[in-house]
């Protein structure tokens, strides 16, 4: 799959516009994980594909409903920056688990991205992630 996005012009997968407006509740959602959480976070199912950008784009295109980075500040901006724009343009909420800015220039800085295909799911995932 190939993803592209231009700020203000939307996001595409293989040339087709992608947009997320809704998501199931957390207990029915399919969530992408990076790392292992210390306890079940309430999802219906989970997947672990091994690449933050791929997982985030899967939320944007509808293959996943959300994404949680369960590691402790393991991702540099290069791990997710392109996918962050795709998600933003597709209507997906993405935030750092600790409320910090995800767009940073310092290559030493690490972040913990969490995404949800709807604001309600994003809030539920952020709340669950903050339990550890």
Task: Tell where the protein language model's regions lie, with residue ranges.
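An extended, acidic
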Residues: 12, 18-132
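DPxDG-like acidic metal-binding loop motif
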Residues: 1-8, 12
């Amino acid at each position: 799959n190939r993803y592209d996005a231009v700020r203000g012009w939307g996001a595409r997968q293989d040339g087709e516009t992608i947009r997320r407006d809704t998501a199931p509740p957390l207990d029915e959602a399919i969530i992408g994980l990076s790392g292992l959480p210390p306890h079940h976070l309430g999802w219906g199912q989970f997947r672990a594909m091994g690449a933050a950008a791929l997982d985030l784009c899967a939320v944007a295109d509808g293959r996943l409903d959300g994404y949680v980075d369960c590691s402790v500040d393991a991702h540099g901006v290069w791990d997710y920056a392109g996918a962050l724009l795709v998600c933003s343009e597709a209507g997906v909420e993405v935030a750092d688990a600790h409320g910090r800015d995800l767009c940073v220039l310092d290559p030493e800085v690490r972040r913990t991205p969490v995404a949800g295909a709807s604001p309600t799911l994003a809030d539920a995932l952020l709340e669950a992630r903050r339990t550890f």
